[in-house]
């Protein structure tokens, strides 16, 4: 079975083809980073227009990469939410139209389920059950996962997501968009311990997060200590250490409360090397395992949508003739497969 996956939830156009026997056959990705850089963030209208320009050419490129034609595709999966409504509508409209034209099923996919299942694309995929840390620009959630669609929300950010806090703090440090990866690079040159940031909400029970205060703390630290290059690097290091430690502490609590031995990390921030190293060290001490996708599958991509679409199709999920997207869509609302 071959599934074409279409991802257009934000500022990446991702197209991929997944075969349930051979694995990933094609993966095409176009990033709009340069388009939005001058604005310091994603401009929804510009994102939608660029998806219109890029989606069909990338589908053609994916078919060529895989050596396939339209007649070889058994289903079309597309991101139906959450995300930017205009961007979602582009991918959903193209996906639904192609499915109708090719006389194959259309499969709406939850963007965050795509991220959650991305580690399944690797040679050593995790087995159920596990605790999932979904950490990106729009979400920071801890989820108990006992099967496909069997998701229990354990905790989430009550304000900024971790990735959003990275980007906002990077902007305070004078870094360009997207700031998260640039902040991490700057942090690698920083001196540990010169500045100490709080670890929000770790001094109380529970698994929720709060990162907006770290941005304010960073702004005050920058204002009080000047902005020479080394000081900025030291502040970046302190900020990253605070976020990573907070995520690690909450993951440890989630593992203790569930009794699970496996931790899955997914989403754009899961590509952070410091976070990966700290969680790997923690899980080794706990005699458990940590799983994550390769870096190119941590950020938005079509491969995770194609894979999640295949899983959902085998569970009997298909779309009707309408084109429906959900900019807000709780993961817990998905049915079990």
Curated annotation (Swiss-Prot):
Binds 1 Fe(2+) ion per subunit. It catalyses: L-threonylcarbamoyladenylate + adenosine(37) in tRNA = N(6)-L-threonylcarbamoyladenosine(37) in tRNA + AMP + H(+). Required for the formation of a threonylcarbamoyl group on adenosine at position 37 (t(6)A37) in tRNAs that read codons beginning with adenine. Is involved in the transfer of the threonylcarbamoyl moiety of threonylcarbamoyl-AMP (TC-AMP) to the N6 group of A37, together with TsaE and TsaB. TsaD likely plays a direct catalytic role in this reaction. The keyword Acetylation does not apply. One of its GO terms (molecular function) is iron ion binding. Its EC number is 2.3.1.234. Signal peptide: none annotated. Belongs to the KAE1 / TsaD family. One of its GO terms (cellular component) is cytoplasm. The keyword Acyltransferase applies. NCBIfam families: gcp_kae1, T6A_TsaD_YgjD. Its cofactor is Fe(2+). It is found in: Cytoplasm. InterPro entries: ATPase_NBD (IPR043129), Gcp-like_dom (IPR000905), KAE1/TsaD (IPR017861), Peptidase_M22_CS (IPR017860), TsaD (IPR022450). Its main location: cytoplasm. Substrate binds at residues 134-138, 167, 180, 272. Fe cation binds at residues 111, 115, 300. GO terms for biological process: tRNA threonylcarbamoyladenosine modification. Pfam families: TsaD. PROSITE patterns: GLYCOPROTEASE. Keywords: Acyltransferase, Cytoplasm, Iron, Metal-binding, Transferase, tRNA processing. This is tRNA N6-adenosine threonylcarbamoyltransferase. It comes from the Bacteria.
């Amino acid at each position: 079975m071959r599934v074409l996956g279409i991802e257009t939830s934000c500022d990446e156009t991702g197209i991929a083809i997944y075969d349930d026997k051979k694995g990933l056959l094609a993966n095409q990705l176009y990033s709009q980073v340069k388009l939005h850089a001058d604005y310091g963030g994603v401009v929804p209208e510009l994102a939608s227009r660029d998806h219109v320009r890029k989606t069909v050419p990338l589908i053609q490129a994916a078919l060529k990469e895989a050596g396939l034609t339209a007649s070889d595709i058994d289903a079309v999966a597309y991101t139906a939410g959450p995300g930017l409504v205009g961007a979602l509508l582009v991918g959903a409209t193209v996906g639904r139209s192609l499915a109708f034209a090719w006389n194959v099923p259309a499969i709406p996919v939850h963007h965050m389920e795509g991220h959650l299942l991305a580690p399944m694309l690797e040679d050593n995929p995790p087995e159920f059950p596990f605790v999932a840390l979904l950490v990106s620009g729009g979400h920071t959630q801890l989820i108990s996962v006992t099967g496909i669609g069997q998701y229990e929300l354990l905790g989430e950010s009550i304000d900024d997501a971790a990735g959003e806090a990275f980007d906002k703090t990077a902007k305070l440090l004078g870094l360009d968009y997207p700031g998260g990866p640039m902040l991490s690079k700057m942090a690698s040159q920083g001196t540990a311990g010169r500045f100490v940031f709080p670890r929000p909400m770790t001094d109380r029970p529970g698994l929720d997060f709060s990162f907006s205060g770290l941005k304010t703390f960073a702004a005050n630290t920058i204002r009080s200590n000047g902005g020479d290059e080394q000081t900025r690097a030291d502040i970046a290091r302190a900020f990253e250490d605070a976020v990573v430690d907070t995520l690690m502490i909450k993951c440890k609590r989630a593992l203790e409360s569930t009794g699970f031995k496996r931790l899955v990390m997914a989403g754009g921030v899961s590509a952070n090397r410091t976070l990966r190293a700290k969680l790997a060290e923690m899980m080794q001490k706990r005699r458990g395992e940590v799983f994550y996708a390769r870096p190119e599958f941590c950020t938005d991509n079509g491969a995770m949508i194609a894979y999640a679409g295949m899983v959902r199709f085998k569970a009997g999920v298909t779309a009707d003739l309408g084109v429906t997207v959900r900019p807000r869509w709780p993961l817990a609302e998905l049915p079990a497969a």
